[in-house]
From Swiss-Prot:
Biased composition (Basic and acidic residues): 475-484
Compositional bias annotation for Basic residues: 578-590
Name of this chain's protein: Arp2/3 complex-activating protein rickA
Gene3D superfamilies hit by this protein: 6.10.280.150
SMART domains: WH2
Gene that encodes the chain: rickA
Main subcellular location: other
Region (Disordered): 307-484, 516-535, 555-602
UniProt biased composition (Low complexity): 555-566
Biased composition (Polar residues): 591-602
GO terms for MF: actin binding
Superkingdom classification of source: Bacteria
Species whose genome carries this gene: Rickettsia montanensis
Amino acid sequence: MTKEIDINKLLAQENNALNTILSQVNELCEQNKQLQGLIEIQNETKALEKEYNRSLPWFKRFVNTVSNVKYIFIKSEEQLTNEAIKYNNKILKDIDNKIYNIAEKSVSLKQELQEEIEKNFKDLTKKDLSKDQRERLSEVFFSYKSKPERFSALHMTNPLQFINAEELEKQYNSLNATKQNIQNLISENSNVKELKEIQKQVAEIREEVPYTFFEKLNNIWQNVKNVFVNNSEQVLAKNKESNTRTIRKIDEQLYKTKHKFEELIENKERNINDIIAKLPDNEELQKIVSNLTNHMASTKEPILTNSSLAKPLENNITPPPPLPGNNIPSPPPPPPPLPGNNIPSPPPPPPPLPGNNIPSPPPPPPPLPGNNIPSPPPPPPPLSGNNIPSPPPPPPPLSGNNIPSPPPPPPPLPGNNIPSPPPPPPPLSQNNIPPPPPPPMAPVSAQTEKLSKPVEATTVKKPENQPRPSIDTSDLMREIAGPKKLRKVEETDVKVQDSRDLLLQSIRGEHKLKKVEFDPNTGKPVAHSHSKPVQNVNKLSGVASILARRVVMEMSDSSGSESDSGNWSDVGVNRNTKTLKTKRERRKILNNRNSQKPSFVK
């Protein structure tokens, strides 16, 4: 009773301010009288103005009238222009601010105001409004004008007063709207028992300093999301889509508010540090600094770290575990044999897998066997330079020399063979081409057939000796570890491929085969200068045959031998000197040859 008397006295003192608010409400109704329901509210406003007794029941009717004006503006917002909506919101904020200033002068009146606003809001949300309109209504109900004195007047020491209290006011209003959205979500899913218990906790949250308000609201929100996650979809199937949208929106609101608080706290921390730096140093100040540091460290921890933050109605999809079927071999030193892999593992030191083959750089790369196991595929014939063990007993040097040596032609080994003439042929051994006889094709083919048989036989027998390469694994790794040796292999392979192409062209040309000859001792091709004496001999033998024919023609001719012998002597001189004195004499000799050829044919 005493509280009501104090409230009535305060309202009587604020009679002029209340009349000003009533005139503003009447003006709003007059400017928007085309909206349905505002005429009745305008009549109610005039009735309130005529009453001179400003009591608590009158004040509650007055707050209810203002709430009804907000409800009509939200419901009929589509009928208004953007300019009209902005003007109406501006007037409503001014009205709310004036009502709040009056209620601030009495604690009991402020409490009555908050209870009446909350009651009116619950009654209005039960009316025919869409979900978006309800959210908009909650924003309008808690959209008081910025009041820096609200938070700057807190009982704190001077350095701790908030300078930018307008930002805190905005976060305070945003938290009120978020709280109302949570209450709406709970009321829409009232069939869940757990949510009914949480609804009481939301209603009991005190609107204190914005940051503590946020902490309490966020903790309750995590419990609400846990209820949605733990309940089956059959219970929430009715409002699943709307619940998902609302949950996402509330999460976004709390996320923005959290980061805004962090920004404000960091700015305030800088201000406090600047003030502390100007004060004289003593023990009490050091304690304050340490307490501030500990408090800021605990405050900067992420608040929205609950495990259910990203879970609401998202089917709780967990990240899939790593698939075990990767093609990358395991790195332990003794890996199991992988016979199916023809591609080496990507790490720089590849493990010695018996099935891995090092491909050579040519476009159709013939694989180099990694552990003396020849590859079976027929299209690319393997480089069998060291796949077949040589007669000497020690095998380790063979396993360590799987990569061909830098010289262009490979070393002579009995396992090398000449393949059939596809475009990418393997290198040719030095013992496969016979010495200089002109028709070399028959011996080459015969020797190729002889050499191909032992290669096939060793290819069949080699898998029996498969465990042997494990002894030479370290030697093989030392040979293939360095990237420089791999580059040398590419260069030597290109050179060998070029010599192979030249040799094949010589084989196909037949008459050019005598230009490429190999020394049986060194295995290197013989230089072209070695065949020049043969060409000179051929030239001399051709001249001798011509002279012999000329002698036969002269002896068979019935003409005088003296003139002919003179000519022959001239030719002999010319043959020795290899030059003619005049052009006329050369033409004369050529004419004599052409005229005497038919007699030789006869």
